[in-house]
Amino acid sequence: MEIKSDGTYVDLTLGRAGHSLEILKKLINGRLICFDKDNEAIKESYKKLQKISPNFTLIQNDFRFLKAELEKLGINEVDGILADLGVSSPQIDDPTRGFSYSQEGPLDMRMNQQNSFSAKDIIDNFDESELTKILIKNADVKLANLVAKAIVAKRPIKSTSELVEIIKNALPAKIVREKNPAKAVFQALRIEVNDELGALTAMLADATQLLKKDGKILIITFHSKEDSIVKNFFQKQNYVDPRLNKLPINIQKIWKQKIIFPSEDEKLQNNRSRSAKLRVVKKLSI
């Protein structure tokens, strides 16, 4: 993102302020607004950002409320928006949060710990049909019906490690050998707990309204479900009825989109970046 020293920018996924720190360093008279649902992220990032500049505002809320929160601050347009989607490394690495399928922990997965709805509520209360539906909808889980059936048969389930064993035992050995099936199941549960796909769709609608001409939206995705939402959203924004092409008028697209993949060096340094895609979308000045 090309940062203007007097611009207004939004980091929708603050995390531990990795992106925000770099943006804030380049602002002189500009302003940075940061969102995160996680109170720990807000507290830890504040300590880092205040050492750089006072030109930032932290908002503990879901980025689905982007437009409403900016309106409270008297902001109705911005120069750039960044979103690094999914769960953050500190959340995955903390076993007490329940995001990791490789560590023992509670069935939690809440990004905002002030919310009451957790993964355990889904696992203990959703029927087999509902479980199958979310496993497919959120992560294309292979043989989702078998996983759902096993979860219902074995509940109540107390921990992440117990859930992992149930998932593995429910599926043919060949599938388990190919790839740890718990990864997709945990993704599906996490997305459902935090309504990540619904929030993403709502945020995109707000972001397109707020962005100035020549401004950019940068979105880092990590799986096909969220990436297809971003891609399809901007394709629809640029859609032109083929019948209009026959008219003697010049119809121009509003959005220009490109994709950047991680380099081999980046993949080696950060294994989690292997599945990442950076979509850069520019609002054209027409």
From Swiss-Prot:
It catalyses: cytidine(1402) in 16S rRNA + S-adenosyl-L-methionine = N(4)-methylcytidine(1402) in 16S rRNA + S-adenosyl-L-homocysteine + H(+). It comes from Metamycoplasma arthritidis (strain 158L3-1). Belongs to the methyltransferase superfamily. RsmH family. It is found in: Cytoplasm. One of its GO terms (molecular function) is rRNA (cytosine-N4-)-methyltransferase activity. It comes from the Bacteria. This is Ribosomal RNA small subunit methyltransferase H. The keyword S-adenosyl-L-methionine applies. Its main location: cytoplasm. It holds the Pfam family Methyltransf_5. Specifically methylates the N4 position of cytidine in position 1402 (C1402) of 16S rRNA. Keywords: Cytoplasm, Methyltransferase, rRNA processing, S-adenosyl-L-methionine, Transferase. Gene3D superfamilies: Putative methyltransferase TM0872, insert domain, Vaccinia Virus protein VP39. The keyword Cytoplasm applies. One of its GO terms (cellular component) is cytoplasm. S-adenosyl-L-methionine binds at A17, G18, H19, D36, F63, D84, Q91. HAMAP family: 16SrRNA_methyltr_H. NCBIfam families: 16S rRNA (cytosine(1402)-N(4))-methyltransferase RsmH. Its EC number is 2.1.1.199. GO terms for biological process: rRNA base methylation.
